[in-house]
Amino acid sequence: MSFVLKLIEEGEHLNQDFKLRIDDSRKIAKTMSGFANTDGGRLLIGVKDNGNVAGCNVSEEYHMIEAASNMYCRPAINFDIQVWKVGHLSVLEVKILKSNSRPHFVEGVNDNGVTKWDA
C-alpha cells in the first residue's frame, strides 16, 4: 500500500483534513493558520470526506493554497507540497509545520463590511 493510501486510511483527525477541492482561499487559510498555530497538519486535496480518492487539478489547487497563504494569512504560512498518484488520479498533500512565527492571523470581513483578523 502506498504512503498516501496509508494516510487516507487514517481518516480525518486533528492534524489531517481531506478536501475534494479548494473553492475558497480565505476559508482554507483558516485551516492552514489553525495547523500553523498549533502542532502542524496536513491537507489531502482530491480526497472526499469518506476517504474516496477523486483526484484534483494539481496546478489549480496549488494556486489556491498559495493564494490562501500569501493573500489572507499574516504572516504568510510556509508549506510543503507533495503530489501523489493513485492510479491515474492526483492527490495533493499540503504539509504545514508548527510555525515559529505564531500567531498567524487570517483576514476576514465582519457583517458590517469591516476588515477583521482572526487567529
Predicted segments with their positions:
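Conserved N-terminal catalytic/coupling substructures associated with nucleotide/phosphate chemistry
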Residues: M1-A119
